[in-house]
Design a protein with these regions (language model features):
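Long, compositionally biased interface segments
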Residues: 207-265
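Short helix-loop boundary/capping segments
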Residues: 148-218
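Aromatic (Trp/Tyr/Phe) and Gly/Pro-enriched flexible surface segments
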Residues: 33-110, 164
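Secretory targeting and sorting signals
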Residues: 1-31
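Carbohydrate-recognition beta-sandwich/jelly-roll modules
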Residues: 37-42, 168, 236, 256-258
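Extracellular-facing segments of soluble proteins and assemblies that are Gly/Ser/Thr-biased and enriched
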Residues: 92-177
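Short, hydrophobic/proline-enriched secondary-structure or compact coil segments at domain edges
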Residues: 73-77, 119-127, 140-142, 236-245
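Short, surface-exposed beta-strand/loop "edge" segments at domain boundaries and coil↔beta transitions
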Residues: 80-91, 130-135, 149-152, 169, ...
Length: 265
């Protein structure tokens, strides 16, 4: 689902000698170099290669995540209680690329859809998922824009890949295909249009997993093109991975995350 836009914050409190300049930023524990993000705060990690974004956009209940500054994060508390109906309370995530004009360093994105081949964009992601009474998914959120850049939300296509979910939730829109084979796994496919804006296509794994390794995004992009949801002239601008949470979510964790972009001539 689409996040509404949030405020952007930086990763620490910076004080210059003499007290002439002070920048107030998310709380940092110097003892363990832990950055805590709440509400819609973000921070740059892995020397700017990725951004961690708490992105609580659908709930006013307290939710916070922490990160060590590497390509990882965990949900340390969440009182989100949106239940099984309606939109999630948030989407704590990590991303590479540009989101609402906030871009990571050296991402290799954007990249035009027409130039994407097998192995051009791959991703690995390891998670921990608590189960229990929590309602959530573990999902990629991949954004395509009609032009090369945008300072707002992408206006082409939102392509989601649910690698797992817990609780009675299914993707936005209507099921358009079932047991579709992509990259050696099977997926149910859902699509929902949004008036005057982008559409959302979701590939839900029929057998959920907690991790993926070298997931090739090309077969998903090609499938979306074949269904008429994605144009080859559009641009892939960001790859996100995280957890849409409808109920609770404490203990959800991204253990590691990477996106590799190979530009081929």
């Amino acid at each position: 689902m689409t996040p509404l836009k949030r405020t952007i914050a930086l990763p620490a409190a910076l004080l210059l000698a003499g007290g002439l300049l002070a920048v107030i930023l998310p709380a940092v524990s110097s003892e363990a170099a832990i950055t805590r993000l709440c509400n819609s705060q973000t921070t740059s990690v892995s020397s700017g290669a990725y951004t961690v974004d708490n992105n609580e956009w659908g709930s006013g209940a307290p939710e916070c995540i922490t990160t060590t500054g590497e390509a990882e994060f965990k949900v340390v508390n969440s009182s989100i209680a949106n239940g099984k109906d309606g939109a999630p309370g948030g989407y704590p995530n990590i991303y590479k690329g540009c989101f609402y004009g906030s871009c990571t360093s050296g991402s290799g994105l954007p990249i035009e859809v027409s130039t994407i081949r097998a192995g051009t964009v791959t991703s690995s992601w390891r998670t921990a998922q608590p189960g229990g009474g929590n309602i959530y998914n573990a999902a990629y959120d991949i954004w395509f824009n009609r032009s090369r850049t945008t300072g707002g939300l992408a206006n082409g296509l939102e392509l989601m890949i649910w690698i797992n979910h817990h609780g009675p939730k299914h993707p936005y829109g209507s099921e358009v295909a079932s047991n579709v084979s992509i990259g050696g796994r099977t997926y149910d496919v859902f699509y929902g249009g949004r008036a005057g804006s982008y559409g959302t296509v979701t590939y839900e794994m029929t057998s959920g997993v907690s991790s993926v390794s070298n997931l090739d995004l090309r077969p998903f992009e090609a499938n979306a093109v074949g269904r008429g949801y994605l144009s080859k002239s559009w641009w892939l601008i960001s790859v996100q991975a995280g957890f849409e949470d409808w109920q609770g979510g404490r203990g959800l964790k991204t253990k590691s995350f990477s996106v590799t972009v190979h530009h081929r001539r």
